[in-house]
Every structure is written in structure tokens, then in C-alpha cells.
């Protein structure tokens, strides 16, 4: 099967040109996540910053709900610390990035949100399982390209026994992306208010 190249974001539009997530499972079981988001801001909806919604619960394959415990390490814009605060909603935690007293000029910006999560993976039989919605589906504009990588402690290469992805609206099982030889997952087409969920299993 042929693999289509990712579309580029038009210069006049607002959106995320690249959503690159680096996840590392630490020896203590905490999942360390760095979300590198490349924004094209055009003073349309991105005027002061943005908000990043994260789930407070995740539904396990057996139907039980697990509480996710977050620690926000920090937020940067172009490598410099950026103001942020948390808003709480039913089932969601929002990281509100930016200063409402400061107008963000039009331009291209690299934001990084660094956080850690407890209870993010599940022990299932003789293997561990991570199911993670990489981008969330609450963005008011398109995400043009998504990348996700997962590293295990003290293990090089691709140690996973299963890797999969699911895209679309909640409950859909489309696979709008591909799995690379090194275990990373990348999207194929832009996303708008859709999930990009990855599955990793390892012994």
C-alpha cells in the first residue's frame, strides 16, 4: 500500500503543524511525557495562548476506570518558561498556557508541555499495556502531523510485542497512520477533533 505524505498547513491558517510526543516509562512506573507542539498562530483563536485538555480517568480494557495522577513539570515557548495554570472539569484537567494580559503576535511557535503520569499503564497477564490518546480531541483547529514514541527503561531498540493505533471519533477503529520500524507511530492525514490513540504491549 502506498503511504501519502503529510499535508502542509497553509500559511494563512491557524493550527498545529507538528505534535511530537516523547514518552518514557521510568523505572518506578511513572510515565514521563514531553509534548512538542509547533503552532502556527494567526491571531484567530490563538490570541494569548491555548489550553491542553488531559483526561483524569482512562477506561481499561476490562471496563474499570483508573484515576490518572499528573505532575506538571513545566511549559516552555521557544525554550523559555511560559505562564500556565490548571483548570478542573468533570473528567478533564486543562493546562491553560499563556498570559491573558499579553497578546501573542502572529508567528510560528514551539511549545513544550512536560508532565508525568501515574497509573497510565496496566499489567495484563504476563505483559504490560499502555493505551494513550496522544493528542486529545478538543483542539479547535487541525493537527497536521502527529508523532509518538515510547521508551522503556534501560532497553534499546524496539522491545514491544504489539503496537497498534486507532484514529477517528470516540469508538472508531480507523488507522490513519503507520508504525515505523523503530516503534514510533506517525499520522498520515491532518486531524480535527479526532482521537489519535496508540497501544503498546511489552513483556
Where are these regions (language model features)?
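Lumenal/extracellular ectodomains and adaptor appendage modules
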Residues: 2-203
